[in-house]
Amino acid sequence: MSAAAGPSMSAADGLLALAEEAERRRDFSTAASCLDSALSPPHAASLLPLAEARARLRLAALLLARSKGLATAKAHLERALLLLNPLPSAPPRLKLLAHSLLANVYGLLGAVPSQKHVLRRGLALLASASASGLLPAEPSLLWTSNFQAQLASAFAAEGDAASALSALSEGAAAATELESPQLDLFFAANTLHAHLLCWEDSNSVADAAARVADLWDALTDQEKEHWVGLFFYTELLQTFYLLRVCDYKAASKHVERLDTAVKSEMQRGQRIKELGTELSAVERSLAQPMLKERERAALVHKQRQLKDQLRALCGYDELNDVLDYGDKLLLAPPPMHGEWLPRTAVFVLVDLMVVMVSRPKGIFRECGKRIQSGLQIIHEELSKLGIVDGVTEENLEHSAIWTAGLYLTLLLQFLENSVAVELTRSEFVEALEALAQMKNWLTRFPTILQGSESTIEMLRGQYAHSVGYFDEAAFHFLEALKLTENKSMQSMCQVYAAVSYICKGDAESSSEALELIGPAYRTMDSFVGVREKTCIIFVYGLLLMRQQNPQEARTRLASGLKIAHQQLGNIQLVSQYLTILGTLALQLHDTGQAKEILKSSFTLAKTLYDIPTQIWILSVFTELYRELEERGNELENSGYASKKEIDLQKRLTEARSHPFHQELVEKVRIEIQPMHDLMQKHHEMPGSVANADLDIPESVGLSTPQPSSVRRLIDTSSVRRSTRRRVS
């Protein structure tokens, strides 16, 4: 530029102009370099305060958009506010933007008190600007919505659910006054999110879920098509809610919609990326000097066409929103924007939901495909963060903690489901290797994944039980119980430990099982949903059978089977219920019913490739044929059972000789040493994801207290396999 040869002021202006031009071309690294140069000596001294503040805001926004240089962005924003505050001529929108961006940075850095302080200052500034007429009503309401949503996130990060809900209520009121369906749905979804996190009143949660559904249904088809981020957010929240209340049939319908939407969205995202690349090439050509008029006119026409195509494809008015579409699933209009989770994480989460609704039905082939696909994508995302072999959490940059925690938690969710599938299929080596991976990730990232320690202990118990180490299994289940404050998970640990004690077979172990299951039985109606109840009834029925009380056991188990069949849809649990009921029918000499029940049970066990349960059923069939004096059937059945037993023993021997077997079953808890500094940072991260007691993915609009995990809502144990048991 000719201005570059002029005085320092002109050089600074030239750099700012170059930055603006680079931003238009979406060459953000060049734009950031130009802005940085303009704000550095000797150019910075010549900038007027307002121009300097604008430049610092632009640079900070670029750094935040690319998730780089949080500390640098914070310094620029703090300096920008110092410049803007005493300037009466500074536009209110600029000051409000500075407050909002700085609050966002404080949130990302875990400085929640500073975040809340800046947000309250922003709200005070907003009230003053609105009262003086400097800010029209509509922008004022939008900024109110923005600050209240951020404030709710800050409160949630501190575990103050009541204050978070209050802030969301204030934001929702502003959205209603704006008559914005998008913001109405945004705040309704965040309110549901908050209720799911604290879950103090089931009716309030149900009402929040119903309001979200009603608002979504009221949208036009065009709005539903264009507000893709809100679609994924609300559908996943509804899915988490339905899984929590054990309405798997309704949850499956939401998962089907999500899965279809992911496929469509991936295609659309690819098309947008292609058009965006083409647009960038056209704009680079337009920036070349000495273009002929005809060439320039053709390029301008092409540029207009591409922009129109992009807008039509996405439904956004702002071109930057369109071009960012391939990276973000936006939830709300400016100045809020924001995403819930990274786009890729949302797609991976949908894969996980498919696994979770498919696994109890025994659809293992689809589960396997989704698990492998999810793991591959997660490893790719972790590689982008520098998390490769040998890297531990002490090597992580602070800005990467939240994203790393999210993907690491999703990784463990997929591995947990892999362990569950392989144990059900009696593929013990595969289960062992997946569990060993979980243990390895925990030891490498003990702070971020600390909340998964209880789940891993529980899975060690599941593995130990499956390969016949019942004493070790009970130890790990009870260790898992100590590591969680989640009442539901504690109950399931008691159930699993009780089953392991029963399988030991001696009188003392049966007494220990009764001590565990008795308190759980008395409180089983207090849980949300019916998962805990069906499992507790199952174990209680086993104990009654062991105590030679077959009629009472039969009555209890029949009630549990009805719930398991109608509400849970977990065919392994149904198979095992049927097996015990068939056994009881035989004990009561009801051979006709016993035969019919056992046939149904065996069909389900074969569907699941569940060899231990098949052997269990075959052993009962042998007794049945012996009582009926059907010698031929007895011998044939016994021979078939022997083949199955040989197959099982081969699998067990292979697992027990594996190098990782002993360290997984031994009665020693995994030793982890969380890093104190990282733990403090991670606990303060508004979207951190590592506590097994908190089963939900975090949102930008609303985050959780303490390090939390996707499992806070997903709660994979809600459809966990019932532990296999071999009771004679």
List the predicted regions and their residue ranges.
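Residue register of alpha-helical TPR repeats
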Residues: 13-14, 33, 52-56, 75, ...
